[in-house]
Amino acid sequence: MWINFVKLRLFCCLLAVLMVVVLVVNVTQVEYLDRETASATFIDSGGQFVSSQVIRISRNPYCGYERQILSSRERLEEDSLLAALQWQEPDVGPVPFLKSTDPSSSYFVILNSAAFFRVGSQLEVLVHVQDFQRKPKKYGGDYLQARIHSPKLQAGAVGRVVDYQNGFYKVFFTLLWPGQVKVSISLVHPSEGIRVLQYLQEKKPDRVYFKSLFRSGRISETTECNVCLPGSLPLCNFTDLYTGEPWFCFKPKKLPCSSRINHFKGGYLKGLLTATENAFFQSGVNIKMPINSSGPDWVTVIPRNIKETNSLELSQGLGTFPSGYYYKDQWRPRRFKMRQFNDPDNITECLQRKVVYLFGDSTIRQWFEYLTTFVPDLVEFNLGSPKNVGPFLAVDQKHNILLKYRCHGPPIRFTTVFSSDLRYVANELNGIVGGKNTVVAIAVWSHFSTFPLEVYIRRLRNIRRAVVQLLDRSPKTVVVIRTANVQELGPEISLFNSDWYNFQLDTILRKMFSGVGVYLVDAWEMTLAHYLPHKLHPDEVIVKNQVDMFLSFVCPLET
């Protein structure tokens, strides 16, 4: 009996050991799978749900970002975002300038040419790129922008570009108005330049540097600051306690970290490129240069049947592309009827008894400036804030309107921001009660263009969490997101704020806020589709259309 008991005990021990071994093997396999692949369902650029295997992208960790504590859902989302933004880099070695993309020898042709098209028809354009020796290129990776327009009608819309990775591109347009419609295709950057921009994004995120002034009594010191600082010198850790957003400054030699009084842009690093790389960034040669047509560059569009009018005028669903178009200089969204606020009284009536918060960079500060200029009853209060920095406040006491603007937290390239005014949007949102008379608009993008994408994803994750909480406690709060926009580019600005960088940020923004319950002002299409030159701060006619769209969300047309 004793022997049987010993055997039974031994058997149980062996069984326990076997179970532990199996458990360890399974855990190891799960961790391995988690590192390599993850199954995901996400929304593609067309707004359609796509089930896919998301491959974990191998990226160099940036500072402390590899030590982020992410939930499995957050990790999956980040991996899918990075995978979706993987630019199709050609598998070629170093390319000499003469073999890079030459917009002047490249051309496009209208494929489905016909005597005329009807409004609502699809127009397809084939682009073939060649090098400076007029030889066809065998790989893709160029960044193109495309639009259709009718100058006499002040009409315009953007097109969707598909890269076939063999030197050919196809552009798809939806013809949205009658008349003579012209096609315009531009090379923003050749694929050889994109490779340089990718390198800078991952290896040189400190190419814009920041500084802070520390002062105590008569002693003052200025040190460099950033999301991440190199070396082993002592640091002041200004990481936000609530959001976990990292920010550091080199510690002053004689002063405590608590003596910091401001933040400002230090400057831009010079000498980032070699002579060979510089050749890929030349104004008038290969930056935002037109690609000419081989044959007609226009088509004739006739009105559609009367029965089809309503179905095209308001196309429903997230997948609507383009999201809108210009006609007679007025933006016409395709998903809803936008109001025209041409009289200041219309805006006053809309915003009566409301508190409006504008958070973000200088592109949404333009909304504050437009509203306070256009609406005479909105009187700006002098808060003693630095010019172009804020915070700013405007009040209409008669109609009980309060309008506020505050810039987002670092990184921000403004001239001088007091330390007390360095506020993160997520924290500000957490302090808002919300309700039917509360309006929030957010624009956060331009100051993140020099950083790895994980930095921007983290910022939007924090903002989104705060937005969801705000809408949860006050569902009638109106929250509007302003997207990125295109801008003028030269050899230097391309290295810091290229449209290619901002296109990535814009894609992330749209995906992360899809399905959250916010409204979107599509500043990207509204600047790209317009006939005016691209600017970081668009001209007033474009800003007016943006504000009209914003106000249309706040005060929609009665149906």
From Swiss-Prot:
Q: Which family does it belong to?
A: Belongs to the NXPE family.
Q: Which residues form the signal peptide?
A: 1-30
GO CC, alphabetical: extracellular region
Per UniProt, the keywords (alphabetical) are: Glycoprotein, Secreted, Signal
Q: Where in the cell is it found?
A: Secreted
Organism equals Bos taurus
Which sites carry carbohydrate? Answer: N26, N237, N346
What's the protein name? NXPE family member 3
Cross-referenced InterPro entries: Ig_E-set, NXPE4_C, NXPH/NXPE
